[in-house]
Amino acid sequence: AGKARKQLSKNEDTKLKEQYIXD
C-alpha cells in the first residue's frame, strides 16, 4: 500500500487509486 501511495503522487490518481485499494 505504501508503495502505491507513493506512486499516486506521480502517476494518475484514478489509476493508482485502484492499485492502492487493491494492493
UniProtKB/Swiss-Prot annotation:
<protein>
    <recommendedName>
        <fullName>Unknown protein NF005 from 2D-PAGE</fullName>
    </recommendedName>
</protein>
<feature type="region of interest" description="Disordered">
    <location>
        <begin position="1"/>
        <end position="23"/>
    </location>
</feature>
<feature type="compositionally biased region" description="Basic and acidic residues">
    <location>
        <begin position="9"/>
        <end position="23"/>
    </location>
</feature>
